Regions:
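N-terminal export signals
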Residues: 9-30
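Beta-strand-rich recognition/accessory modules
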Residues: 49-66, 71-73, 84, 265-393
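Polysaccharide-binding surfaces and accessory modules of carbohydrate-active proteins
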Residues: 50-54, 61, 68-70, 105-118, ...
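Extended, loop-rich substrate-binding clefts of extracytoplasmic carbohydrate-active enzymes
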Residues: 64, 125-206, 212-214, 330-350, ...
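Low-complexity, Pro/Ser/Thr- and charge-rich linker/hinge segments at domain boundaries
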Residues: 231-237, 378-398, 456-499
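C-terminal beta-strand-rich structural cap/linker in extracellular carbohydrate-active enzymes
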Residues: 371-373, 846-868
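Catalytic cores of extracellular degradative/oxidative enzymes
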Residues: 478-748, 752, 756
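Carbohydrate-binding surface patches
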Residues: 782-830, 854-861
Length: 868
């Protein structure tokens, strides 16, 4: 019998010679080892073991671990249930090469305590337990208000003795009937649930709650755990082992390739839009490949809030993973118990009231979908709102926000929940309601849309002031409030930049994590880097003077060694107590220079000052070329320092622009040396299947540099893959301001690297796809690019134009049945040679800006034109 190896054992063993022997006990790995022994003769045992593991699919690596008891098929969806808990343990796709389970279970999330479970399929409630007969509240001037009861938790995870599970006729049914023996078990209501296959590749979950008490029942919390397979930390921590005080887990670079493989192929990201009946959650692999799993309420079911319970017994033994998401249909008790009274969630909080014997039904649907665009269609088909917004959910004053609401019925009423919202235009076209909105005054702007017999969906925008003025105001604030001017500072932070504490209205000088106030690291460089880049576009003499003083008196004197160009970890340090945490760095630790990330920031600060000097002539202390040379030397140190030197770093893509300016200055030797370092870095990114790691468990700091480097060095396939991975970071397209267009990092939205990754997505030039619906289908113009497509024979059904890829795809047809040949002319193309493909063949043609193509109509359903 084959010896099984757990995921953590797999990770633990990779990277050690002893680990090679353990890995070879797995039959598939042993067989592969035999086949590759000759090729690996020049490798160390460690390298050979790692290569053998990476050569397998992640599906093979984990194949021995899945053990489910009940299975249901719905189209391409395979659903597996665990009869012990009455929960869904797995949703996979038929034929998936990775066999990814979208949901979390005891296998992919080891360490959870099933005795208080919150698996997908569990129900978490909090009811108001009356202390006696409910009496009308007396609220007069002299009346004494008496609380009628207290909140009491009732959960399926504590109701095993009343759980009844059955599987008949392809229906999985779970019932909780009778009072549970445990205190937090279900006692106040009867719960009936069932699962059946829906249309296409979908699963439908029906829930019915019935009040079995003799009194009015208030359910102040009714939440459905969605346990996604998103325990990334489990790949870094040993179950029951000590927590890594740095918060980064065990970042062992010998194990990183396997960890990244498992993260991208076996884990999922969860994107939430929680705003009423049109709510949804999108689960997808970080790899970004379709299909995705969409979870959304149907019928009269609305999610109003989402949260986690990291302190629950279910996750008490976990390290780094905070538990499943709870999708709350009602959350009034949650607000009260968590003391959110002064800070309620954006949709408000409600309770469910049931009279004795009264029932309430809910429904949730799980569906495999082929694309991001399909989210809107599925929500629309459920009778809710498919929402599109342009240009964004964060809108500056004076900019219109355009909203398209695809719905089966018109909007009944729009309630404005914030001040200074103007609905400039509202019209119904076909099955779409089009809104033009305008906002005034900074802050959240919320609208409640009522439609479809009592359904509702909230839209939450955020209004900001003029962006240019905000950038200028931020620059002034950095100079006025964060530029440190104490020449007697014992840590040499004079003329450095320190963070600002809004709680006390001052910069702060001390922190338990010393790097926060030490001038280096992201905490130390954020102000100076912003200020330098801001002055490239909006120069201010005072700010440039401050930047030069910063470089001369602090950065290039104490933070960075002016002789060696090494960058220290922190100027600030502490004497340690026996009780000190990891962040209390000693003087010796603060002087460490191995962190690759600390080099890219000063390199870019110097490069910004070079550009400021070249463009505006505002420099007083150094010439522009001196700053460029400092940037060059820092880059060379960057590409040769630390374990992260050849992975992507935030702003790392700017090395391409530094290289271009060095070439422009005619520094051939420096150009060639830096180019060679960049080539080596890019090659490692190309060779690594998933070059998106970090010093942390999960991060988004690598992607931007990987994208621009692979583009610069012509690695088309890795560049395409990186775009796909980048899209997955913000794949939900949730129309709410704090999630729309923001990278998802673990549980965090609005992650600081979203703007840099946004540069990559904007640069990738997503193609413009258009389906012609003007009734003629003869002509289309891409206005911004001045490209015209016109057909004289046949009709254009669909066209996809990509400026960045210099390609055009057409789908043509002929409604008359008389045209045997499709004939079209394209104007506005870049001059040069083009590859024209259709009908399984291709040819090269030259264009002076115009191109005429004729193709048999039978082959015109797929015509592709690509710049050669």
């Amino acid at each position: 019998m084959a010896k099984k190896i757990s995921r953590r054992d797999l990770i633990k063993n990779v990277g050690t010679a002893a680990g090679a022997a353990t890995l070879l006990t797995v039959p598939a790995i042993a067989k592969q080892a035999q086949q590759t022994s000759q090729q690996s003769s020049q490798q160390t045992p460690q390298q050979a073991a790692l290569e053998r593991v990476l050569s397998q699919s992640s599906k093979q690596l984990l194949a021995d671990h899945e053990d489910y008891q009940v299975e249901m098929t719905a189209g391409d969806m395979i659903v597996q249930f665990d009869k012990r808990y009455g929960s869904i343990s797995s949703i996979t796709r038929k034929g998936d090469e990775f066999g990814t389970n979208y949901l979390g279970d005891e296998t992919n999330t080891p360490g959870v305590d099933p005795s208080d479970s919150r698996f997908t399929g569990d129900v978490v409630t909090t009811v108001w337990g009356l202390l006696g007969e409910l009496q009308p509240a007396k609220l007069g001037q002299n009346d004494i208000f008496k609380v009628s009861g207290r909140w009491k938790h009732e959960r399926t995870g504590k109701s095993a003795d009343t759980r009844h599970v059955s599987f008949r006729n392809n229906v999985f049914a779970v019932k909780y009937d009778g009072p549970a023996s445990e205190d937090e078990g279900i006692r106040s209501y009867r719960l009936n649930m069932s699962y059946h296959a829906g249309e296409g590749s979908s699963l439908v979950w029906d829930i019915e709650i019935e009040n079995v008490t003799s009194q009015v029942l208030e359910i102040g919390e009714l939440a459905l755990p969605l346990m996604a397979n998103d325990d990334y930390s489990g790949l870094y921590y040993e179950p029951g082992g000590p927590a890594a005080l740095s918060g980064g887990g065990d970042v062992d670079f010998n194990r990183t390739p396997v960890r990244q493989k498992l993260i991208h192929e076996q884990k999922v990201l969860a994107h939430h839009f929680i705003a009423g009946h049109s709510s949804y959650v999108l689960l997808q692999r970080p790899l970004g490949d379709a299909p995705f799993l969409l979870v959304h309420p149907t019928m009269d079911t609305a999610f109003e809030c989402t949260y986690k319970e990291p302190e629950s017994a279910f996750t008490a033994h976990m390290q780094g993973w905070r538990g499943p998401d709870l999708l709350a249909i009602h959350s009034w008790a949650t607000k009260n118990l968590r003391r959110w009274g002064s800070n309620p969630w954006v949709n408000g909080h409600t309770s469910l009231i049931l009279k004795p014997g009264e029932k309430k039904a809910y429904q949730v649907r799980f569906a495999l979908i082929p694309s991001y665009e399909a989210i809107r269609e599925e929500v629309y088909n459920a009778g809710n709102l498919g929402i599109r917004v342009l240009p964004s959910m964060v809108v500056q004053e004076g900019t219109d926000a355009l909203v398209e609401l695809k719905s089966k019925s018109d909007i009944d009423k729009i309630k404005l929940l914030s001040d200074n919202i103007t609905i400039a235009k509202q019209q119904r076209t076909g099955d779409k309601t089009l809104l033009t909105l305008a906002f005034k005054g900074r802050g959240q702007k919320s609208l409640k849309l009522h439609y479809g017999d009592g359904r509702w969906t909230n839209l939450h925008f955020y209004c900001i002031n003029d962006i240019a003025q905000l950038l200028k105001a931020r620059g002034k604030f950095v100079v006025d409030r964060e530029f440190y001017k104490d020449p007697d500072d014992p840590y040499h932070r004079f003329h450095g930049f320190l963070p600002f504490d809004y709680r006390v209205g001052s910069t702060f000088l001390d922190s338990d994590e010393v790097w926060e106030v030490g001038g280096s690291d992201e905490s130390g460089f954020s102000e100076s880097l912003f200020l330098a880049e801001k002055n490239v576009y909006y120069p201010a003499k005072e700010e440039v003077d401050v930047l030069e003083a910063y470089v001369e008196d602090c950065l290039f004197k104490y933070i960075q060694n002016p002789q060696t160009y090494e960058v220290r970890a922190s100027l600030y340090w502490k004497d340690r107590y026996p009780s000190s945490g990891w962040g209390h760095w000693t003087k010796e630790r603060s002087e460490a220079t191995f962190r690759s990330y600390n080099y890219v920031h000063p390199a870019n600060i110097y490069h910004a000052l070079y550009r400021v000097g070249k463009r505006y002539g505002l420099l007083m202390r150094k010439k522009p070329e001196e700053y460029l040379r400092m940037s060059y030397h820092t880059c060379m140190r960057w590409f040769g320092t630390g374990p992260w030197r050849h992975i992507g770093l935030m702003e790392g893509s700017n090395a391409i622009h530094i290289l271009a300016d060095i070439q422009r200055e005619g520094w051939k030797d420096e150009h060639d040396k830096l180019l060679q370092q960049m080539k080596e870095c890019a090659q490692q990114m190309i060779d690594d299947p998933y070059p998106y790691s970090s010093e942390l468990v999960i991060d988004q700091t690598a992607h931007e540099q990987v994208y621009f480097f692979t583009k610069f060095f012509g690695a088309t396939e890795k560049n395409r893959k990186t775009v796909q991975v980048l899209k997955a970071l913000r794949g939900g397209n949730q129309p709410v301001w704090f999630r729309y267009g923001n990278d998802k990092r673990g549980d965090i939205c609005c992650w600081y690297n979203a703007s840099l990754n946004g540069l990559a997505l904007l640069d990738s030039g997503d193609p413009i796809a258009a389906t012609l619906k003007d009734g003629l289908n003869k002509r289309i113009r891409f206005v911004e690019d001045k490209v015209d497509v016109e057909t004289t024979q046949g009709e254009i059904q669909r066209v996809v134009w990509s400026k960045s890829k210099r390609s055009l795809e057409l789908e043509m047809d002929d409604s008359t049945g008389l045209a045997k040949t499709a004939a079209l002319t394209i104007q506005g193309l870049e001059k040069g040679d083009y590859k024209v493909s259709y009908g399984g063949s291709s040819k090269k043609v030259s264009s002076d800006g115009a191109l005429t193509i004729e193709a048999p109509m039978r082959d015109a359903r797929n015509i592709r034109i690509q710049k050669a």
